[in-house]
Amino acid sequence: MKLRKYTILTLFLFLFGALYLNGCASSRPEPATPYDGTDYIRESELLPYDLADYETIPTNPNGSLSVPTYITRLDDQYFIVDCYHNQVIYHDNLTDPLYLWKVMTNDLSMGHTIASDGNVYLIDDTENNRILIMEKMQNSSGEIVYVPTQEFTGIGNRPHYIIYDDYTDTFYAWSSQSGEMFLFRHTNDSTRMYLTKVLSIPELDGVYVRSFTILDDRIYFVSGNSNIIEADLYTFEVLNRYPVPDAIAGMIQLEKIQNYYYITVSTDLTGNQDFATLIRVKNLKDLAKGNYEDVYANFLGGGTPYSLTRIDDRYYLTEHRLPGHSIWSFRVENDEITDVEAVY
């Protein structure tokens, strides 16, 4: 009888353990299936265009950048969002002078970021509460051109940050002052974009939050109200709040690099840019105690660091307020910042 009880108990523990482990291993839903175009809030508004208007591509009229807010590489081209010049520019290398770059679009009012899935390019037109959609085409000379083909108007209050997440096959566009996230998708056989869902963090309505970061099945919102918020990516249920000191409350971006969270800070809680810096911390809980490392001296300091992006094995930091230093490049090896270079 005892042997039978032990056998049943052992079997129960084995099955419970297997279920528990399987549950933990599959806590995140499977990668998104292709979108079928049937379930959506609204579809994009189509923009008229004539390829004949793109026989000549304008070059960048500016010899310097004015508050560059984002740099990335999409396909074989580098793109810079030149925010205060109201344009996105592109080029095939980072060594040529800026006046050789070409203008992708200047139909923006203070755009901040650009994202692509290889088929469409989405840009947040911040002050117009608009998402601009562009597509890559060829003009009659066979030259690659970028053409505005669609748009979404009335997108929240100052959409400020947009990314494409391959796992969920979704573009996420954050409305920086309404606490809303707008999700966009398209079908495999068409570039027509659909607004498929709007999620929100109600406590961030009316709070200026500049960006977010997706890490697996979690999404992190940088501090706009003295807290970094961690939420479930799929439901936006708030899971954790990480208080931060007033001196670093006006954050811009959070990026996980090896064992540290790197965070760019624009202002303190009162909006004073004299507190602008770049910090890093291993555990977000340590921020409340002031246990973080200021690493801005690696980039001279004195400006306002903005966005962090990764291209191949290097990271890129944009900044402003420091003449002659708008974009930096660096590596991180064994948690050490190395090979720092001024790009533009």
Task: Name each model feature, range by range.
Residues 246-292, 306:
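Loop/turn-rich, solvent-exposed surfaces of beta-rich toroidal or solenoidal domains
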Residues 87-90, 129-135, 178-185, 225-232, ...:
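Structural motif
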Residues 55-86:
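Beta-strand-rich domains and repeat architectures in extracellular enzymes and scaffolds
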Residues 80-84, 123-127, 166, 172-177, ...:
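Conserved beta-strand positions in repeat-built beta-propeller and related beta-rich domains
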Residues 59-64, 102-107, 150-156, 198-205, ...:
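Surface loop/turn motifs at the tips and blade-to-blade linkers of beta-strand repeat domains
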Residues 66-70, 109-115, 156-164, 205-215, ...:
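Repeated scaffold domains used in trafficking and secretory/extracellular systems
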Residues 302-344:
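Blade-level signature of beta-propeller repeat domains, shared across WD40, Kelch, NHL, RCC1
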Residues 31-66:
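A short helix->beta-strand "capping" segment at the edge of beta-propeller domains
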